A protein has these predicted regions:
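Conserved catalytic core of two-metal-ion nucleotidyltransferases
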Residues: 78-113
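Active-site nucleotide-donor binding segment shared across nucleotidyl transfer reactions
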Residues: 26-67
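Short amphipathic alpha-helical segments
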Residues: 4-6, 52-56, 101-103, 121
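Short glycine-aromatic motifs
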Residues: 34, 77-78
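Helical scaffold of the NTase/Pol beta-like nucleotidyltransferase catalytic core
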Residues: 1-38
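Catalytic cores of NTP-dependent nucleotidyl/adenyl transfer enzymes across multiple folds
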Residues: 114-126
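Short amphipathic alpha-helices in soluble, non-transmembrane regions
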Residues: 68-76
C-alpha cells in the first residue's frame, strides 16, 4: 500500500530512542555479520523536522554475506525486497513489529556507493 500524502513532524528526541530499540533487535539477530548499524536521513538529525520513519542502514562486509544476512533478518520477520533498482543497497520490509517505530531497513556492503551517499547526506544535514 502506498501513502497518498506525506506527513512532516517537528523533531522528536524519541526518534533516537526508537533507533536504539531497532538497532538492538538487529544486533541480536545479525551478530558479527553487521559491521555497524547506522541511523541515516533526517530523523537522525537533532532539531530537524522529518517524516516519522526511521531509516536504518545495516553495514555488512561485502555481498558474499548477503545470503546469510537475508536468512538472519528473515528469522526476525524481515522480508528481502531486492535492491528496488538502486545498486549498492538491499531493501527489507516487515510485518508484525508493533513494538518498533515505523522504519525503513537497508543492507549495504561496506564499500557501497549508496552507503557512502547515505552517510554523506546525513553528515551534510548535521
Amino acid at each position: 500500500m502506498r501513502t497518498t500524502h506525506v506527513v512532516i513532524l517537528p523533531y522528536d528526541p524519541k526518534w533516537n530512542e526508537d533507533f536504539s530499540a531497532i538497532r538492538a533487535e538487529l544486533e541480536a539477530a545479525m551478530g558479527e555479520l553487521a559491521l555497524r548499524i547506522e541511523h541515516v536521513r533526517s530523523t537522525s538529525v537533532e532539531g530537524m523536522s522529518s517524516k516519522p520513519c526511521i531509516d536504518v542502514d545495516v553495514v555488512i562486509p561485502d555481498r558474499t554475506c548477503l545470503k546469510a544476512t537475508i536468512e538472519r533478518l528473515a528469522s526476525i520477520g524481515y522480508v528481502h525486497e531486492g535492491n528496488l533498482r538502486i545498486e549498492g543497497r538491499e531493501a527489507f520490509c516487515y510485518t508484525g513489529k508493533p513494538h518498533l517505530q515505523l522504519h525503513h531497513l537497508y543492507v549495504c556492503p561496506a564499500d557501497s556507493e549508496e552507503l557512502r551517499r547515505h552517510i554523506t547526506f546525513r553528515e551534510f544535514l548535521r
